[in-house]
Amino acid sequence: GSLRERRATSPASGRGSGAGDVGARVAVAARAWLGTPYRHQASVKGVGADCLGLVRGLWREVAGAEPEGVPPYSPDWAEAGGRELLREALERWLMPVSVEAMRAGDVLLFCMSPGVAAKHCAVLSAVEGPEPKMIHAYWGRAVVESWMGVWWRRRLVAAFRFPEEA
């Protein structure tokens, strides 16, 4: 079932020895995707991935089978559709967290243009240092790790965390 259903039937503490367990696993797993070529709609480490494909692949590695199928989508789906489809999917399966409480392993959601649905996601890979770092599928290139500079921070609209039972 959905995260809401799982939360209602599972202990609040989840499993594992601490709250950072799943986030640390996600961040480590994301680094293994670095260099994976950008491929629209793909989700295969070392072969191809887009931003959603990276998150889907990390889910498979950390939590198991994907919880729902992803219908085909065009590169301009956010501009054409108007609905917050990516945000809605993340809200179904991940736990929303405040931007101030973000930690490594959290999934970040970005809105690239005002008035358009949020359409890019990344994984926060490090919070220490001069500014945070993130791992994401860079359009037309590859999965990369980059600084989350001012340009990205201005476009950040939400953050989500993998459930502890993952």
Segments the model singles out, each with a brief description of its role:
Residues 1-19:
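Intrinsic disorder/low-complexity segments
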Residues 20-27, 68-144:
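...with weaker cross-activation on analogous glycine-rich loops/strands in unrelated enzymes
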Residues 20-36, 147-166:
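Non-catalytic ligand/cofactor/substrate-binding and regulatory segments of enzyme domains
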Residues 34, 59-63, 126:
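Hydrophobic/aromatic-lined pockets within catalytic cores
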Residues 38, 93-98, 155-158:
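Short secondary-structure junctions
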Residues 38-43, 66-71:
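Surface-exposed patches in mature extracellular/periplasmic domains of secreted proteins
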Residues 43-62:
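Active-site nucleophilic cysteine motif
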Residues 45, 129, 141, 163-166:
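Residue-level detector of flexible, active-site-proximal loop/helix-junction positions
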